[in-house]
Amino acid sequence: MKKILFLLLLLPLMVSAQTYKYIGVEDGLSNRRVYYIQKDKKGYMWFLTHEGVDRYDGKEFKRYKLMDNGEELNSLLNLNWLYLDHENTLWEIGKKGKVFRYDPLRDEFTLVYKLPEDVVKDRPAPISYSFIDKNNNIWLCNDEYLYLYNTHTQQTLQIRNEIEEDITDIEQIDETHFFIGTEQGIHHAELKNRALHLLPCDKLDNLPIQINELYFHRPSRKLFIGTFERGIYVYDMNTKRSTQPRMSLTAVSITRIKPLNN
């Protein structure tokens, strides 16, 4: 009897089932094409779709328009990245170099920065990748220049892209060091004195692969590298070695790497 009671008491602790719910356009989602999903500290789910930004409170959707001088921006070149920074501020960024910030007091997205006309006039998509670092900088990247918009000072720093390749992903290691993935490989770089400096790293420099996704695990100082049709690589900063796990998913394209339960 004691054994049975013991098992029954433990049962609630052992069961941790997840609840999943399908939501789609019939529930109010503005479009079936969803490019990014974020969850803020209030529990709202934010979806960047082909129509704009949707917020879901668990019951219903609310759609937000992205406006520039009275014109709604709903083309694919303006709907590319949806980020939450370390201060829980929501940002939407497009390949045309326009940056929107969500204003919770006015409950709307406000255009806070856009690239100068002389930068965008000859390039329909002047930005190949955007990234928010822990120094409050929004990176707007192409193969020639990096435009760093500081969200606190509203100042923009233009620096030369020393890699001279289209950037596909960035992972920040510490205050000044970054891993930068491109369509040709991966690079170790330092952002210092208003310039990007490439640092030698033979185990990465000699890895000619197209990078889709980077994830840096700080406790182990390991970089997980998701590639296009080459599976996963792992670079250990402690041993300076690059390896492929036994289950490397060779010939598979890796588009996202996320830690479990995070």
Predicted regions span which residues?
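Carboxylate-rich, polar loop motifs that coordinate divalent cations or form catalytic acidic clusters
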Residues: 1-262
